[in-house]
């Protein structure tokens, strides 16, 4: 055995590749072993070092793969089982136990996270050369007993199913130990690179190979200064020191110091030595020169997007200088956080890259299909789960328009639960739906699912057969084939991997659960968890790509240019935590009680030395230039500067602040069309808030001119954010069809309010006729109609019964009317709403109870009112009352709070009550002596009082009574008849002259709106009260109206101070009237 070490400025790959080449020339078969995470990059690096760039005698691989070479054809091996298979085995085992059988884990036996922890522990036991029986140092005897029960039963099932119950490395070691491979091990050399520790399983294998006389060469990085030191704790080389010293002691071999022909730049050598001195408490006189600082830089950036943008620009610059993509390595502090930004921005800059991290299959349509199918069963046919299943593209032969109609009906009829999905649809909205076609589609879609779902607990093979029948009935394979037609080779390979994962899980289920009785829900849960946990196996599509991976997988001298992103304190260093079923304390006790080659790894104990060595490797990862970037905001939160970067700053490494300047005339902008186009669009969307130099003005004017020429050739235009809220005039033919010239224009008070809220809202509702999707569930409209009907019946009841009897009778009659019975007895939610409405009716009815001088003249009085033969106003008055003096009043029931506001009325937003007064005066043919005492709202509610604001309990009835009163506008002459407390008269009393003025101005509002509507030009002008915010309907999804950009288009309401409001607005109305008179 040879143990080699070298200073980090030298290249260990060159040294070990040379040793491998010498052994190959001597006729040896050489295995060059690298860690799992580095094997791909290591293979390329080693082969590039060899003069021939290839060798049949040297195999670059991993420990486990090397074991396969020797035991691949051994007849005693069992069938391989993957993690999904192990999950199934543990699930089967745990299902066989009762809660009482497992004293500690009994309540967790169906928990998916717990099962995954068991699988991890199972694999860790194999890697640690331990058995479950050696877990005798646990803090709880019951915990040990449970684990022994579980793992013993697992081993029994694996043996009975002829599965591998040991790893390939363990089987290889066993064969070596028994002498079955002595011949194969002759003339064998093993070179090991990139390790700072071995697992117990790997170390045991190395010991057995060493005993058989196999040449073993192990290399690592240690400085001579560190090797000679007697104290290594805290040293940046502690991980490799402990590693090499442990091997030297065990195998009685003295480590040798070696050097390579290649040596790193002085900048990186000095940086390493300064970093080492910081942690071994020694003095160093080394200083980074200005030339050294050109090779190592820290970038201080604003956020992740800016960070990746700057890196992408720098990569483009390297290409501009003649370098290749493969010369660049990008390292990430948090790979998950950067994956999306890297993908979007590198694509924009046309940078091909390989992301060295497993990609989940979870977004594939087949995984969506399995996920939705399981959720349909688990949640008993929720509408969203059923529709997601149908939308997967793999279910049946459903056309998109059929799917849209089905979804619309499911939403309308609130179809949920298998009972509703399996029965004919019967509810209709006045003929809106084609129930015959929908029920035909429902039967086609639901029949296969109905057959599958009704499966009772049975043997696994029987469930598989029924699933196969289901998949055939819905044409899954044909749909999958159509799905993958015409895709790229990369996508094709991904589709094949997903399908293989799907079939392998089913095969393993057949093997493990074939003769076991289980429920369909459990089977679908296993299938879903397996598919969601699966990852794609990805390899670079090309050699010339930028490699992107996590920084903790880096090695010294990895590439010419290295960018390390996200180097904040949260991720650099990374603190690994133990989340397994065996605590660190228990692991330490077990290690003390077992031999050296049988031990648990204690990752938390390794954190410090591993992080130091990783940081040292990172600082030496580049051979020409290293850039470490530090975002001020990472994952939408501020983070601190890494302690390692603070050390570098103290050593003199420069920190460059990278701002967000997108206007600079840089060469990389010229060399990349997509990035230039993207930046021009970005600039076009935002105001340029800085002055450009003459050089920058020239650059951008030439760049934009070039882009316009290129886009014109391709028939493209630069998209713009529309700062103009301009609409097209509706065609004259459309307006003539909608509003014939020879007929008056139909309006209502609600239509008028809509017009003055936002003219475009009126266009959508009354010209296009757009409506919100309805449902059978009662909404505010249904609630209002219900309460209207109750009060209508109460007021019509002329019997001698007391008021409460009349009210209860009215509620009972209303509840049994078909229109309400159908709506409010659909489900518990509807019945709950009905109970609330009954309470509201009883509370509000107290206004009508007792001594009341008012008599109901009529209910639901429809009217038509003509204005100048040009406008026809239609509406329905809820109730007309008559006072004892014969004057009439108007009552409008409201399910929400409403009052007559003079300011809103002036601005066209509250015309209802005044319109009703005009309609009553016109329809009843009232003369000048007939009076209308008022028009008012009655808020139907169950008043709630905040007791915290009550000064005394006696005030509660007064407050409640105040809330349950008529609010609107009242005639001053009738004030004496309205003083019974049921009418809110404060600031609501108007003289007859003032009422006439309101009526006249109301007509003006209608005429003005009708004139604008006839033109067919509808503005996007939601109203604003203060000119700073918008209160009107903005219709953002349609108009893209944004208050900060389009405020000039909003209609600012005319407002007056509170004290001047009444007289001021009346004066304005009078002046408008006089202006009209003068014009005439």
Swiss-Prot record:
Gene Ontology biological process terms from the UniProt entry: double-strand break repair via homologous recombination
Cofactor(s) for this UniProt protein: Mg(2+)
Keywords: ATP-binding, DNA damage, DNA repair, DNA-binding, Exonuclease, Helicase, Hydrolase, Nuclease, Nucleotide-binding
Pfam families, per the entry: ADDB_N, PDDEXK_1
InterPro entries associated with the record: ADDB_N (IPR049035), DNA_helicase_suRexB (IPR014141), P-loop_NTPase (IPR027417), PDDEXK-like_dom_sf (IPR011604), PDDEXK_AddAB-type (IPR038726), Restrct_endonuc-II-like (IPR011335)
GO molecular function terms attached to this record: 5'-3' exonuclease activity; ATP binding; double-stranded DNA binding; helicase activity; hydrolase activity, acting on acid anhydrides
Top-tier EC class: hydrolase
Keyword Nuclease tagged: yes
Superkingdom of this protein's organism: Bacteria
EC number: 3.1.-.-
Similarity field: Belongs to the helicase family. AddB/RexB type 2 subfamily.
Subunit annotation: Heterodimer of AddA and RexB.
Function text: The heterodimer acts as both an ATP-dependent DNA helicase and an ATP-dependent, dual-direction single-stranded exonuclease. Recognizes the chi site generating a DNA molecule suitable for the initiation of homologous recombination. This subunit has 5' -> 3' nuclease activity but not helicase activity.
Further remark: Despite having helicase-like domains, this subunit does not have helicase activity.
Protein name as catalogued: ATP-dependent helicase/deoxyribonuclease subunit B
